[in-house]
């Protein structure tokens, strides 16, 4: 990103796109590609995102689906078209991309060659919400608009739905992102490090044999609470040689108790994630035009009952957990909507509420969690 910012200021890039600055955004990848080897550019007819490339292979038709394009940091979120000034820096023009279509658009039928290979005929291919979080958020079993969502997996993505982009000095300072929603809405959200921390620790613990997530949670439950905290989003946790050592080093450098056992380390991670969610939810509430009364946790991480409970306690609001396979469910029901079987987003969410059994977790010991929040904030700021 820094090389790109030499050509256009970081603030200007954010103002034009509303997308969180991250080094893997398509804008920066294409910039680096051109600088390091531009031989492919003259040979390129169209640039397709991966979901659109798959659709092309199935149908022979090229499109650019809105939700995946919105994450590229090349799209104007107000006009929903590629920003020419950003493309020009990368020696590109809008005609290098296929036409932008909304989620739920019928791209076409399976091509003849695919039909021959598969034995399937007259099958429509739908442009689903190509960004997995957009599909997952569609599957949030919300009853009204006064909620935030947390798509919980290796990454935790916490946000709200907005009818319009929210791009201002606050969102820039907090590095919030404005990604496209499946219904053309905006998903104002923050990327947070999620289960990555526990996944990497689990690899270390399994050197001596298999360790289950249930065993990790049980060990954490048996450990003393609120002994040490980390900032889950600290760069030192991005790709350390040993996640356990990185967590211990963080605690050592901030003058805290140094966790040693599996339970102590896991508890440190879960409590710190819950407090990080509290932090981000507070920022979201300051940006939202409505009261956030509930947090919906969806995705694989929603199966972690301990973290769900910790999160409810930390935020002081009810948490509704599930469904765990939100991305797949949202994808399927969006196709049902395209086929005319389902009317709209509200009906999709009603179907999900009736088809699955989301678990509601009420907050407990809120004052105790509030007391220890300041200790988390001290070490969060310190590194």
Model-derived features: where do they sit?
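Short beta-strand to alpha-helix junction loop
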Residues: 78, 103-107
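A conserved helix-loop-beta module that forms one wall/lid of the active-site cleft
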Residues: 87-103
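Glycine-rich Rossmann-fold phosphate-binding loop(s) that bind the pyrophosphate
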Residues: 300
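Active-site core segments that coordinate phosphate-bearing ligands/cofactors
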Residues: 5-18, 22-23, 28-61, 74-76, ...
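Short, well-ordered beta-strand elements within core beta-sheets of diverse protein domains
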Residues: 72-76, 97-99
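Enzymes and membrane/adaptor proteins characterized by extended Gly/Ser/Thr/Asp/Glu-rich
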Residues: 60-68
């Amino acid at each position: 990103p820094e090389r790109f910012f030499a050509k256009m200021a970081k603030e200007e890039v954010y103002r034009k796109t509303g997308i969180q600055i991250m080094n893997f955004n398509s804008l920066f990848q294409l910039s680096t590609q051109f600088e390091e080897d531009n031989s492919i550019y003259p040979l390129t007819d169209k640039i397709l995102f991966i979901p659109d490339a798959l659709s092309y292979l199935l149908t022979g038709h090229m499109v650019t689906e809105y939700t995946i394009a919105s994450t590229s940091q090349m799209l104007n979120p107000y006009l929903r078209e590629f920003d020419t000034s950003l493309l020009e820096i990368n020696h590109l023009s809008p005609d290098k991309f296929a036409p932008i279509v909304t989620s739920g658009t019928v791209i076409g039928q399976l091509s003849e060659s695919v039909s021959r290979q598969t034995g399937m005929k007259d099958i429509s291919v739908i442009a689903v919400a190509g960004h997995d979080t957009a599909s997952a958020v569609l599957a949030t079993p919300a009853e009204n608009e006064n909620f935030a969502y947390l798509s919980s997996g290796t990454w935790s993505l916490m946000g709200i739905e907005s009818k319009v982009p929210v791009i201002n000095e606050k969102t820039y300072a907090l590095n919030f992102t404005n990604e496209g929603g499946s219904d053309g809405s905006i998903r104002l959200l923050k990327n947070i490090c999620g289960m990555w921390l526990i996944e990497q620790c689990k690899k270390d613990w399994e050197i001596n044999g298999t360790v289950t997530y249930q065993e990790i949670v049980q060990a954490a439950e048996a450990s003393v609470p609120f002994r040490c905290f980390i900032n889950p989003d600290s760069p030192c946790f991005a790709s350390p040689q040993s996640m356990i050592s990185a967590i211990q080093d963080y605690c050592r450098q901030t003058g805290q108790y140094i966790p040693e056992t599996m339970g102590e380390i896991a508890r440190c991670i879960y409590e710190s994630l819950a407090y990080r969610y509290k932090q981000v939810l507070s920022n979201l509430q300051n940006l939202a035009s409505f009261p956030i009364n509930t947090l919906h946790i969806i995705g694989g991480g929603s199966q972690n009952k301990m973290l769900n409970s910790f999160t409810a306690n930390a935020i002081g609001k009810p948490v509704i957990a599930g469904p765990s396979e939100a991305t797949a469910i949202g994808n399927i029901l969006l196709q049902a909507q395209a086929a005319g079987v389902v009317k709209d987003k509200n009906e999709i969410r009603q179907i999900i509420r009736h088809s699955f059994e989301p678990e509601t977790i009420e907050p407990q010991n809120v004052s105790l969690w509030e007391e220890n929040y300041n200790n988390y904030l001290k070490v969060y700021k310190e590194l």
